[in-house]
């Protein structure tokens, strides 16, 4: 009797040893596609003990005993590891490198006759068509998730705009403020935060205007709104002068690793382009015939579409012709701009919302022509007005006037002589008629004539 009790105890111990290990509550881990995922496994002993990692269908992944690591024949063989530095603290994590969506499943850690289940869910967030987009293009953020999951995602742009959705988020008409880090949070029981860097390819300014006096040197600058370590592409500046009927190409160039190589350049006007970034052009002289608008384009290698910047040139000219002082501007200007002429340190003599103003008989001295917008002076030109005087009479004018006077005198004399001659002719005819009448009367009263011509009584 006494000998059977130890045997029953021994049998009970053997049966307990053959039972499966006790399973604790499942831990859920959210991981990012392409990154390292850490699955936790800990023991209360806080010391190094043997442990094993398996899949839910009992395929061995990794095991450690006496610091000796063994790897099973699984799809993770070349992507798994553990933190040896944490084993002595009773922590035996499984590290999965380059995590993939298909790695999402339940993993089992066996340690101290216990089983700890860890459910891994791997998510991916991709930007389409790319993380580098041209200004004005649309951005689509697509969430990849494990089968059977139903996550939601919320993204916040650098400008603070929030968008929410399930699998796909779209943003149209990207601008420079959208360039930067986008923070996207995936909600699937837990939260997983993605940070994705979006670069909007654009010039810092969509449009710029340069105001210059006639004859001054002009600098056009086209700084980029993004940092570029290696930039390759080609560009062109097409110009539409205000006085021209059509636009023409002023310059074309190639950009190779931030070096500028000019291909073709016009000879009129004289242009010079810088060899380094930022892209910039120099026009030797600002002349009225060059005033107008240009379209500067840059096509980047591997990108569909072009970067655009509009550039305008406004030129001011002040002239004095005889007794007229005139100020004019050429180029694209707003109807709100004010053009004024005034003596220095005095009130404006004339001020109009037009492209030309003038003053008749200007006082001698220093005059100023101002182009302003709501009181802000955009362009100023100074001019020293000379005393005005009556224009000298030209010899040709005297000759013409003398000829006209002589012609008038000759014509008057001719008319006078004709009238006088006609008057004398009429007077002679009248005297002749009187003489004839008198002659006839005398003949009729003669006696011998009367006797011959009169009939007897």
Curated annotation (Swiss-Prot):
Signal sequence range: 1-25
Annotated S-S bridges: 41-109, 155-184, 327-369
Domain Ig-like V-type: 26-125
Protein name (Swiss-Prot/TrEMBL): T-cell surface glycoprotein CD4
Heme recorded as keyword: no
Assembly and interaction partners: Forms disulfide-linked homodimers at the cell surface. Interacts with LCK. Interacts with PTK2/FAK1. Binds to P4HB/PDI. Interacts with IL16; this interaction induces a CD4-dependent signaling in lymphocytes. Interacts (via Ig-like V-type domain) with MHCII alpha chain (via alpha-2 domain) and beta chain (via beta-2 domain); this interaction increases the affinity of TCR for peptide-MHCII. CD4 oligomerization via Ig-like C2-type 2 and 3 domains appears to be required for stable binding to MHCII and adhesion between T cells and APCs.
Topology within the bilayer: Single-pass type I membrane protein
Keyword field: Adaptive immunity, Cell membrane, Disulfide bond, Glycoprotein, Immunity, Immunoglobulin domain, Lipoprotein, Membrane, Palmitate, Phosphoprotein, Repeat, Signal, Transmembrane, Transmembrane helix
Glycan attachment points: 254, 295, 324
Domain Ig-like C2-type: start-end pairs: 126-202, 203-316, 317-373
Domain writeup: The Ig-like V-type domain mediates the interaction with MHCII.
Alphabetized GO MF terms: coreceptor activity; MHC class II protein complex binding
Gene3D superfamilies for the chain: Immunoglobulins (2.60.40.10), transmembrane domain of human cd4 (1.20.5.900)
Protein role: Integral membrane glycoprotein that plays an essential role in the immune response and serves multiple functions in responses against both external and internal offenses. In T-cells, functions primarily as a coreceptor for MHC class II molecule:peptide complex. The antigens presented by class II peptides are derived from extracellular proteins while class I peptides are derived from cytosolic proteins. Interacts simultaneously with the T-cell receptor (TCR) and the MHC class II presented by antigen presenting cells (APCs).
A Pfam family it matches: CD4-extracel
Cytoplasmic topology ranges: 418-457
GO cellular component, one term: cell surface
PTM annotation: Palmitoylation and association with LCK contribute to the enrichment of CD4 in lipid rafts. Phosphorylated by PKC; phosphorylation plays an important role for CD4 internalization.
InterPro entries noted in UniProt: CD4 (IPR000973), CD4-extracel (IPR015274), Ig-like_dom (IPR007110), Ig-like_dom_sf (IPR036179), Ig-like_fold (IPR013783), Ig_C2-set (IPR008424), Ig_sub (IPR003599), Ig_V-set (IPR013106)
Transmembrane segments: 396-417
Phylogenetic lineage: Eukaryota, Metazoa, Chordata, Craniata, Vertebrata
């Amino acid at each position: 009797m006494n000998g059977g009790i130890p045997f029953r105890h021994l049998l009970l111990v053997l049966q307990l040893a053959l039972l499966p290990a006790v399973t604790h509550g499942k831990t859920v881990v959210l991981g990012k596609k392409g990154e390292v995922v850490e699955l936790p496994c800990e023991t209360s002993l806080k010391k190094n003990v043997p442990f094993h990692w398996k899949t839910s269908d009992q395929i061995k992944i990794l095991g450690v005993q006496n610091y000796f690591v063994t790897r099973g024949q699984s799809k993770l063989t070349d992507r798994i590891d553990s933190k040896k530095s944490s084993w002595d603290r009773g922590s035996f994590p499984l590290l999965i490198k380059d995590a993939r969506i298909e790695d999402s499943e339940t993993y089992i850690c066996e340690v101290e006759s216990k089983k700890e289940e860890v459910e891994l869910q791997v998510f991916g967030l991709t930007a389409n068509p790319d993380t580098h987009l041209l200004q004005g293009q649309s951005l689509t953020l697509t969430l990849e998730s494990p089968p059977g999951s139903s996550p939601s995602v919320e993204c916040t742009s650098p400008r603070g705009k929030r968008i929410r959705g399930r699998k796909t988020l779209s943003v149209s008409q990207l601008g420079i403020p959208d360039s930067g880090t986008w923070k996207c949070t995936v909600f699937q029981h837990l939260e997983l935060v993605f940070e994705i860097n979006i670069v909007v390819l654009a010039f810092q300014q969509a449009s710029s205007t340069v105001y210059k006096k006639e004859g001054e040197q002009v600098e056009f600058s086209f700084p980029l709104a993004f940092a570029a370590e290696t930039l390759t592409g080609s560009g062109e500046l097409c110009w539409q002068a205000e006085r021209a009927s059509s636009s023409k190409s002023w310059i074309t160039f190639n950009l190779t690793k931030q070096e500028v190589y000019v291909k073709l350049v016009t000879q009129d006007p004289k242009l010079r382009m810088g060899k380094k970034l930022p892209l910039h052009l120099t026009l030797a002289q600002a002349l009225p015939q060059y005033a107008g608008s240009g379209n500067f384009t840059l096509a980047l290698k591997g990108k569909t579409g072009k970067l655009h910047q509009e550039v305008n040139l406004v030129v001011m000219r002040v002239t004095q012709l005889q007794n007229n002082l005139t100020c004019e501007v050429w180029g694209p200007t707003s109807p709100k701009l004010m053009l004024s002429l005034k003596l220095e340190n005095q009130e404006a003599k004339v001020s109009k919302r037009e492209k030309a103003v003038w003053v008749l008989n200007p006082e001698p001295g220093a005059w100023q022509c101002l182009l302003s917008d709501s009181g802000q002076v955009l362009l100023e030109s100074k001019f020293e007005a000379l005393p005005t005087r009556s224009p000298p009479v030209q010899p040709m004018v005297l000759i013409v006037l003398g000829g006209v006077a002589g012609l008038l005198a000759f014509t008057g004399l001719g008319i006078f002589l004709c009238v006088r001659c006609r008057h004398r002719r009429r007077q002679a005819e009248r005297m002749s008629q009187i003489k004839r009448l008198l002659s006839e009367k005398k003949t009729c009263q003669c006696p011998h004539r009367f006797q011959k011509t009169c009939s007897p009584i």
